[in-house]
Amino acid sequence: NTARSRPRQCGTQSFAAAAPLTWNVTLATAAEEHSRSMANNNYFDHKDRDGRTPGDRAELAGYSAQLIGENIAAGQDSVRKVVDGWVASPGHCANLMNPQFQELGAAYAVDPKSDSGIYWTAMFGTP
């Protein structure tokens, strides 16, 4: 929510400060499952190993959404580094700043045998 608290330029898009997101446990569960899948199966993608999209995974977890977005990251060892990377990336920044999103669930998972070691997922939703 700190990133949303002030106006931002995300690539060529300008965003006003956005309202804080509300934590959603269902989105957090879906985010944790995706992070764990990426870590344990050593891949990095918005689609899971079964080809499910973020919207598919949110629905499977029980989240009924009008709008879903997702940011993923890998290898960063702190939340600050992850968010800084997302703010610097136009598409990820646009998800963070999108005023239509109302809820957030996020998680990370670690597998030292994977290429990146740690995998992060943030899921944004509008019920």
Predicted ranges, named:
Residues 3, 34-38, 61, 86, ...:
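Alpha-helix boundary/capping residues
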Residues 1-40:
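A short alpha-helix/helix-coil micro-patch that ends at or immediately precedes a cysteine
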Residues 25-77:
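Short, surface-exposed glycine/acidic/tryptophan-bearing loops
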Residues 65, 69, 73-127:
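Disulfide-stabilized extracellular recognition modules
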Residues 13-16, 46-48, 95-96:
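Short, hydrophobic secondary-structure boundary micro-motifs
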Residues 1, 55, 93:
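Short glycine-/small-residue-rich flexible loop motifs, especially phosphate/cofactor-binding loops
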Residues 10, 40, 44, 92-94:
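Bacterial peptidoglycan biogenesis and beta-lactam-recognition machinery
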